A protein has these predicted regions:
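Aromatic- and glycine-rich beta-strand/loop motifs that create alpha-glucan
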Residues: 1-26
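Secretory targeting signals
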Residues: 26-89, 117-181
Length: 182
């Protein structure tokens, strides 16, 4: 089983399409970070609307690494599953189109082991992609924008999450994203 998993991981990570997803996501995140670095205060003023009249807010402190990561996670909610589906679909269909799937099923390995190895290899890919997103969006945003409390707009108002209570929430968010994509 371990050999099958190694083979599947090799097949996934030798294709340029795999690294294209990493590059697209990195470029997307860097564009968001650049836009918020240049115009973050205006964006935050737009998002919070007329609350400036009722509350005294320092918009420069609201645009921080946690807020940028929150924004990135909400934007990538749609894009990442599409990239994962492309790679995951290619794991089986690419093998079938090349004709090697029939050859593989004729070997003394059960079909369950083959599919399980493909599933686990896809899980490793998803984990690597989410780890890449976490590093690029959270670590780089914290390095560039710093840390402060996170203000989240909800339907019934604003919620302020203190900076010492945020990091574990991001770990759970990435964990739940991993579960959702599997």
């Amino acid at each position: 089983m371990w050999n099958l998993l190694q083979i599947e991981l090799f097949k996934i990570f030798k294709k340029p399409r795999t690294y294209l997803a990493f590059a697209i996501i990195a470029a997307f995140i860097f564009l968001i970070q650049l836009g918020l670095f240049v115009n973050g205060k205006d964006w935050m003023m737009f998002m919070l609307g007329s609350l400036d009249e009722t509350m005294n807010m320092e918009y420069d402190k609201l645009v921080n690494g946690y807020a940028v990561c929150f924004f990135v996670l909400n934007l990538l909610l749609v894009h990442v599953p599409i990239l994962v589906a492309l790679v995951a679909g290619d794991v089986v269909s690419g093998e079938a189109s090349m004709g090697t799937l029939r050859l593989l099923t004729s070997k003394p390995v059960s079909r369950t082991q083959i599919i399980l190895a493909k599933y686990l290899a896809t899980a490793v890919y998803v984990f690597a992609l989410l780890l890449w997103i976490a590093i690029i969006s959270l670590v780089v945003s914290i390095a560039v924008f710093g840390v402060n409390d996170l203000v989240v707009a909800k339907t019934n108002g604003l919620q302020l999450i203190e900076s010492n209570d945020i990091l574990w929430r991001y770990f759970f968010a990435f964990g739940f994203a991993f579960i959702a994509m599997m």
